[in-house]
Amino acid sequence: MLVLTRKQGEKILIGDDIEITVLDTRGDGIRIGISAPRGIRIQRDEVRKAIEAENRSAAMRNPAAEFELIASLTALQNAEDPPPR
C-alpha cells in the first residue's frame, strides 16, 4: 500500500484518468473529490459491504416465505381453473 500525505488542494493521480483532490480537512476526517471516467465505479467501502450483506441475506432460504408463495400461487391457479362440468 502506498501511503501519501497531502494538504488541502493537493492532488493524487492514478493512471491517466483518475484524479483525487483533498478538498478539506476537519478534525480526524478529510473530504476528497474524485474525478474519473464514467465507466469507473467508485464506492465507499462501508456501502459496498452493506450491499454485499444485504444480497447475502436476500439469497438465504426462508421456508415460511416459500410456503406462503406456494400457497398464493396454488390459490391463484385454482381461481383461474374453470369449474368442472
Swiss-Prot record:
The keyword Kinase does not apply. It is found in: Cytoplasm. The keyword ATP-binding does not apply. It comes from the Bacteria. Gene3D superfamilies: Translational regulator CsrA. GO terms for molecular function: mRNA 5'-UTR binding. Keywords: Bacterial flagellum biogenesis, Cytoplasm, Repressor, RNA-binding, Translation regulation. One of its GO terms (cellular component) is cytosol. One of its GO terms (biological process) is bacterial-type flagellum organization. Homodimer; the beta-strands of each monomer intercalate to form a hydrophobic core, while the alpha-helices form wings that extend away from the core. Belongs to the CsrA/RsmA family. A translational regulator that binds mRNA to regulate translation initiation and/or mRNA stability. Usually binds in the 5'-UTR at or near the Shine-Dalgarno sequence preventing ribosome-binding, thus repressing translation. Its main target seems to be the major flagellin gene, while its function is anatagonized by FliW. This is Translational regulator CsrA. It comes from Leifsonia xyli subsp. xyli (strain CTCB07).
